[in-house]
């Protein structure tokens, strides 16, 4: 299910702490991502992304959260073209072992989004890759980073999200038509960025 119904289903899933698919990233040639609200992240969710997404697992944060953590863009000026506004990779300062396990990465996410978190709570480099979103969300930049935060907010699930690009079995980036079996097997709802933009524009009108 796509379109408005898909967006509604995705918002319901996110509100319930489940995963959804983001489609239609305009800055990355239509790449698609798995997404879960950061406040709902678990080791099982990280493992699902690593197993079925196979791309880089990233933490989408607002500029305000990034500033709170002392994070800045690694390569300012390129993020508008790439749709991947990377800050330096992070690890929780305490409570992890090697940092790369699903449990360790989930812990790092929880530490980074805690209300009182600061730069003292994280170390770099690490195994979680923060993305710093544009303040205006998808109305400013139509990428999965901004979409994931907008979706979390609309779902009442905070203002941070974990996303992971989906690769095909042959290593190429997947398109929506490539993951029908994955969507069906796991009951994943699809939020299209174009539909999200249209809804937010109507809300602003």
Segments (PLM) and residue ranges:
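Catalytic domains of riboflavin
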Residues: 1-205
């Amino acid at each position: 299910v796509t379109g408005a119904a898909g967006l509604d289903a995705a918002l319901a899933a996110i509100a319930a702490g489940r995963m959804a698919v983001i489609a239609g990233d305009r800055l990355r040639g239509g790449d698609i991502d798995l997404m879960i609200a950061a406040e709902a992240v678990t080791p099982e969710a990280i493992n699902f992304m690593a197993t079925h997404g196979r791309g880089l697992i990233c933490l989408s944060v607002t500029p305000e959260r990034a500033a709170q953590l002392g994070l800045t863009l690694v390569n300012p000026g390129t993020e508008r073209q790439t749709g991947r506004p990377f800050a330096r990779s992070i690890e929780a300062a305490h409570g992890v072992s090697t940092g790369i396990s699903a449990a360790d990465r989930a812990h790092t996410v929880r530490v980074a989004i805690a209300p009182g978190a600061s730069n003292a709570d994280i170390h770099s480099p690490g195994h979680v890759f923060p993305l710093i979103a544009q303040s205006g969300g998808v109305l400013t930049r139509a990428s999965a980073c901004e979409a994931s935060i907008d979706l979390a907010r609309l779902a009442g699930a905070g203002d941070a999200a974990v996303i992971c690009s989906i690769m095909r079995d042959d290593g190429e980036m997947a398109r929506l038509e490539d993951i029908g079996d994955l969507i069906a097997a796991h009951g994943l709802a699809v939020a299209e960025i174009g539909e999200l933009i249209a809804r937010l524009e109507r809300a602003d009108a």
